[in-house]
Regions:
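Glycine-rich anion/phosphate-binding loop at the beta-strand->alpha-helix junction
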Residues: 1-109
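Internal helix-turn-beta structural module
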Residues: 92-167
Length: 167
């Protein structure tokens, strides 16, 4: 149930100028939007309960680095994406995570390295859990945007080859 969940409900959003997407990400907004529409339809036809490309990757990385309970990745990574082309041709993209289970004190957050990571993010003070949730959501947004752009630009496999992952 994505309406009555535990944890934090968080949304991250961005509007990327068409020029930036084309020059930096090698992917025009229209092409990424079209891919997103295909992906959404595929998820719907497969009976998926979410439509993110890989929320779990960013969430897992942040959870391990910042002392979160990694067992909560499964529940936390069920989320939604939304995209549109703005009237001036820019790309609007958002991610919604309805049940992000995070904390900034207790448990693994007290481990030295994990606490240092939270400190670097400015999330060790009491009451900073909402800020941390926003940072995690921004990480997810960037990951999904990067993956989608790399696939559309036909650079996903070549980047893995270049960086040695497929050796």
């Amino acid at each position: 149930n994505s309406l009555h969940t535990r944890g934090k409900r968080v949304v991250a959003e961005i509007t990327l100028p068409k020029k930036l997407m084309t020059e930096i990400m090698h992917c025009p907004p229209e092409a990424l939007f079209k891919q997103r529409q295909y992906s959404n339809m595929g998820a719907l036809m497969a009976g998926s309960v979410n439509n993110g490309a890989h929320f779990a990757n960013g969430i897992t990385a942040m959870f391990i680095a910042c002392g979160q309970d990694v067992a909560n990745v499964a529940e936390s990574s069920a989320g939604f994406t939304y995209a549109e082309i703005t009237p001036n041709g820019d790309y609007y993209f958002s991610v919604t995570i309805p049940s992000l289970i995070v904390a900034t004190y207790g448990g693994g957050t007290g481990l030295a390295t994990q606490n240092e990571c939270l400190s670097v993010l400015g999330c060790t003070e009491r009451g900073s859990v909402n800020k941390f949730a926003e940072i995690v959501a921004a990480t997810v947004l960037c990951g999904d945007l990067s993956l989608g752009s790399a696939v559309v630009a036909d650079e996903w496999v070549s980047s893995h080859e270049r960086l040695g992952r497929n050796r």
